[in-house]
Swiss-Prot record:
Gene3D superfamilies: 2-C-methyl-D-erythritol 2,4-cyclodiphosphate synthase. It comes from Cellvibrio japonicus (strain Ueda107) (Pseudomonas fluorescens subsp. cellulosa). 4-CDP-2-C-methyl-D-erythritol 2-phosphate binds at residues 10-12, 36-37, 58-60, 63-67, 102-108, 134-137, 141, 144. This is 2-C-methyl-D-erythritol 2,4-cyclodiphosphate synthase. The record marks H36, T135 as: Transition state stabilizer. Binds 1 divalent metal cation per subunit. One of its GO terms (biological process) is terpenoid biosynthetic process.
Length: 159
């Protein structure tokens, strides 16, 4: 059995708004995220990891922010399209591990729902998906509450 690993990263700054979307879950917050799409840093990092594992470039190549059809796009839809491409190339998810870096808002209570959403969109079980959140101990742009970052790693296996 062949295996491939992919890594992804995304970041968005806080801006106007009263909610953010992370892992496909709406989270109330005193800021929104500045983005062309819905700004879901977790799903964007996951898309990059999946695309990278299959050597298909990155999310910007497939869904450029210069293309108005992706304006305010639902990142869950983008994730499903990315996973369809991965599947068409003969790969399936073995596991995915993601880390959200944010001083605020607190993510712990939303993580179980994020796992369910991602597992559903990737046609996998929740046991294949791990989401965790951490702070940067008030250091850097996330520590100053200027934005949110996310890292993602995936392992794919041949179908």
């Amino acid at each position: 059995m062949s295996m491939r690993i992919g890594q992804g990263y995304d970041v968005h700054a806080f801006g106007e708004g009263e909610k953010i979307v992370i892992g496909g879950v709406v989270i109330p917050h005193h800021h929104g995220l500045v983005a062309h799409s819905d700004g879901d840093v977790l799903l964007h990092a996951l898309c990059d990891a999946l695309l990278g594992a299959v050597a298909l470039g990155d999310i910007g190549k497939h869904f450029p922010d210069t293309d108005m059809q992706y304006r305010n796009a639902d990142s869950r839809s983008l994730l499903r399209m990315v996973y369809a491409k991965v599947s068409q190339h003969g790969w399936k998810l073995a596991n995915a591990d993601m880390t959200i870096v944010a001083q605020a808002p607190r993510m712990a209570s939303y993580i179980p729902h994020m796992v369910e959403v991602i597992a559903s969109d990737l046609q996998s079980s929740a046991s294949q998906i791990n989401v965790k959140a951490t702070t940067s101990e008030r250091l850097g742009f996330t520590g100053r509450e200027e934005g949110i970052a996310c890292y993602a790693v995936v392992l794919l296996e041949s179908r």
